């Protein structure tokens, strides 16, 4: 069946151009930008080579791009480098030696509202710690080039330190998000064939202790290949189970390693894997996405410069958990490659009060904020008073990541957080791309902003929107997002499964990388990513994207957040239902429910009218802020909930169940 546009797309502001005086000196005409972009595409290898030369290589490459065996592309073939050296050593040789690299804040606050746990690390501190941990891995446990090291750690400085230490000796990191279950952890350990795991006794989350070591112990019952476990005493718990001969305390190991220890960085090949990161598919077991070293470094370095316009006095904060790819690229590697100062925070965004993030921005003078649309929508619900209590005037750039941002959330953040003076962009990329692909780029050429768009593709990335047959669609028509040429940060494959790599990404449209997202390209060349193509509700043959419906809900002045899922229907095949969180002070009524139905009919069309609307006070989300729509669908269909270990707040599911049962009973009548 051919892909059809909706009768009426969600109202997207294709022609709403936002300018502000603070950035006027940076503005570039759209056609000027695309001329530069086209030149980069036509001279792809020389373009990326010029970027790569800005980094230090132990040995230069012999060939920029080896395309002899597509889709197994190789970048900077013959070149040798080391990520730890690039992120730490080279700064220690300069004035940045005593510059702050990381300011870390734990979740607990004292009675005055000041953080109890704070740490500051200069680039020299980081250099010393990375070398000591590299020695711990290499000298104590024999970790060598190519070995996989699994890290199951919270958001503490030891996580980026250990990643850099592993890369220093040529090991491959396998970071597992600390919210994953024992089964999920075991699966990732086994697939990567890790023989060492690094974890912590626990950490703070919403004022509660989350124990980690016990999860590791349960996982290792199903992962017999692990020989050693290193345990960081984050909380100093006294009752942590330790297996003699296998488990070791981090601090005791480090006591035997002198502060001036130096481990020579391993000069690894450009195509040497730096990390494996597992990402869930719609079917089957998680995919172990593999990224190389040289191409990934060049991609992340370039996009940090272009997208974030890094300056020497910036205080940068990416709120992502390091267990996700955003944390790998834009918490660990990117800011340290640039020699900037960054914030790392352990806890929940709205604990103990909804202004926790705003207090952090004010306390440290954050200038660049990189966060998620889900977080922005959550803060919208709390209202403008909370950010209004704090001085956010240091912010000059805000970017979002992780999912499409609806225009209403964009406008709110731009006005309330940025005081209409920031450069604001919605970046698009994914685990497989390794770094940002589509975004406004205030560090390069800043074209006019549009609320809700991802902006134009960055230089060196040939992005298009195509139909079912792989042909480009006209401006304003929905299609599939693809990348037409290889790029440096692209995945190196799927760990141990090259056939799955080809089938998943390269078979749908031969010669093009299939992203799996719907998108629209407007007449100016800006890309509007609409969400996953598999997050589609098919109503009587019409395809409705969940993003389109949710954006329409949030555009209503009473709505803070919304999640839409499809449920089976005997006549239409499938119909949408919505779980809606109202703004504070708004009362849920039947009249409002009718008003929202009519609002959706007007915004999208009668075909999109939800069969049911449930009012809830919270949506089920992961700790990284992503809405767990599958749980809502399970509630509505009576299906098993499945794995809920990444769920931030279990009461959100119970509330959804209650709302569903109450409305169902009400509709059934006496």
Curated annotation (Swiss-Prot):
Highest rank taxon of the organism: Archaea
MF terms in GO: acetate-CoA ligase activity; AMP binding; ATP binding; metal ion binding
InterPro entries with a match to the protein in the record: Ac_CoA_lig, ACAS_N, AMP-bd_C, AMP-bd_C_sf, AMP-binding_CS, AMP-dep_synth/lig_dom, ANL_N_sf
Catalytic activity entry: acetate + ATP + CoA = acetyl-CoA + AMP + diphosphate
Binding site for CoA: 205-208, 326, 601
PROSITE patterns: AMP_BINDING
SUPFAM superfamilies given in the database record: Acetyl-CoA synthetase-like
Modification comment: Acetylated. Deacetylation by the SIR2-homolog deacetylase activates the enzyme.
Keyword Metal-binding listed: yes
N6-acetyllysine PTM sites in chain numbering: 626
Keywords of the record: Acetylation, ATP-binding, Ligase, Magnesium, Metal-binding, Nucleotide-binding
UniProt EC number: 6.2.1.1
Family: Belongs to the ATP-dependent AMP-binding enzyme family.
Function according to Swiss-Prot or TrEMBL: Catalyzes the conversion of acetate into acetyl-CoA (AcCoA), an essential intermediate at the junction of anabolic and catabolic pathways. AcsA undergoes a two-step reaction. In the first half reaction, AcsA combines acetate with ATP to form acetyl-adenylate (AcAMP) intermediate. In the second half reaction, it can then transfer the acetyl group from AcAMP to the sulfhydryl group of CoA, forming the product AcCoA.
Protein name, per record: Acetyl-coenzyme A synthetase
Lineage: Archaea, Thermoproteota, Thermoprotei, Thermoproteales, Thermoproteaceae
Underlying gene: acsA
């Amino acid at each position: 069946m051919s892909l059809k546009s909706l009768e009426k797309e969600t109202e997207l502001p294709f022609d709403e151009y936002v300018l502000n005086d603070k950035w006027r000196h940076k503005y570039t005409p759209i056609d000027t930008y695309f001329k530069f972009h086209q030149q980069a595409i036509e001279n792809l290898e020389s373009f990326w080579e010029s970027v790569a030369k800005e980094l230090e290589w132990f040995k230069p490459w012999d060939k920029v791009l080896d395309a002899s065996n597509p889709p197994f592309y190789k970048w900077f073939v013959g070149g040798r480098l080391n990520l730890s050296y690039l992120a730490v050593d080279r700064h220690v040789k300069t004035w940045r030696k005593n510059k702050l690299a990381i300011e870390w804040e734990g979740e607990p606050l004292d009675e005055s509202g000041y953080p109890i746990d704070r740490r500051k690390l200069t680039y020299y501190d980081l250099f010393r710690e990375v070398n000591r941990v590299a020695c711990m891995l290499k000298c104590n446990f024999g970790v060598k080039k190519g070995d996989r090291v699994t890290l199951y750690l919270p958001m503490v400085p030891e996580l980026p330190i250990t990643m850099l230490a592993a890369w220093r000796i040529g090991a491959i990191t396998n970071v597992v998000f600390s919210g994953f279950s024992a089964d999920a952890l075991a699966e990732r350990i086994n697939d990567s064939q890790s023989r060492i795991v690094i974890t912590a006794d626990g950490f703070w989350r919403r004022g509660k202790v989350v124990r980690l070591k016990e999860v590791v112990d349960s996982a290792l019952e199903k992962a017999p290949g692990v020989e050693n476990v290193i345990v960081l005493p984050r909380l100093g718990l006294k009752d942590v189970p330790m297996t003699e001969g296998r488990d070791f305390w981090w601090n005791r190991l480090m006591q035997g390693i002198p502060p001036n220890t130096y481990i020579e960085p391993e000069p690894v090949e450009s195509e040497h894997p730096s990390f494996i990161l597992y990402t869930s598919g719609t079917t089957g077991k998680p995919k172990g996405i593999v990224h190389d070293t040289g191409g990934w470094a060049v991609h992340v370095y370039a996009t940090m410069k272009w997208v974030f316009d890094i300056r020497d006095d910036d205080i940068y904060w990416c709120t992502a958990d390091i267990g996700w790819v955003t944390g790998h690229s834009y918490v660990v590697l990117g800011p340290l490659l640039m020699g900037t100062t960054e914030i790392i925070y352990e806890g929940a965004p709205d604990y103990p009060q909804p202004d926790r993030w705003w207090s952090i921005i004010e306390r440290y003078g954050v200038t660049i904020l990189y966060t998620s649309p889900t977080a922005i929508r959550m803060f919208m619900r709390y209202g403008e008073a909370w950010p209004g209590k704090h001085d956010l005037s240091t912010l000059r750039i805000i970017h979002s990541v992780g999912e499409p941002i609806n225009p209403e959330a964009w406008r709110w953040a731009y006005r309330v957080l940025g005081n209409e003076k920031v450069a604001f962009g919605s970046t698009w990329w994914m685990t497989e791309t390794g770094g940002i692909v589509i975004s406004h780029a205030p560090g390069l050429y800043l074209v006019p902003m549009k609320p809700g768009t991802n902006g134009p593709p960055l230089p060196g990335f040939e992005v298009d929107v195509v139909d079912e047959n792989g042909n480009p669609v006209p401006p304003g028509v929905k299609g599939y997002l693809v990348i037409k040429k290889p790029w440096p940060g692209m995945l190196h494959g799927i760990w141990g499964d090259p056939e799955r790599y080809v089938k998943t990404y390269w078979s749908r449209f031969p010669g093009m990388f299939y992203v799996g997202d719907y998108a629209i390209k407007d007449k100016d060349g800006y890309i509007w990513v609409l969400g996953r193509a598999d997050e589609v509700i098919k109503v009587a043959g019409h395809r409705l994207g969940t993003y389109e419906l949710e954006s329409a809900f949030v555009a209503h002045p009473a709505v803070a957040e919304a999640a839409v899922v499809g449920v089976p229907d005997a006549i239409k095949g499938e119909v949408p239902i919505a779980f809606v969180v109202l703004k504070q002070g708004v009362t849920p009524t039947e009249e409002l429910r009718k008003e929202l139905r009519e609002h959706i009919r007007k915004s999208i069309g009668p075909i999109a009218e939800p069969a049911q609307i449930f009012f809830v006070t919270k949506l089920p989300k992961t700790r990284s802020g992503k809405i767990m729509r599958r749980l809502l669908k399970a509630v509505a269909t009576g299906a098993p909930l499945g794995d809920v270990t990444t769920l931030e707040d279990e009461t959100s599911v119970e509330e959804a169940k209650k709302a569903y049962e109450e409305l169902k009973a009400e509709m059934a009548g006496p």
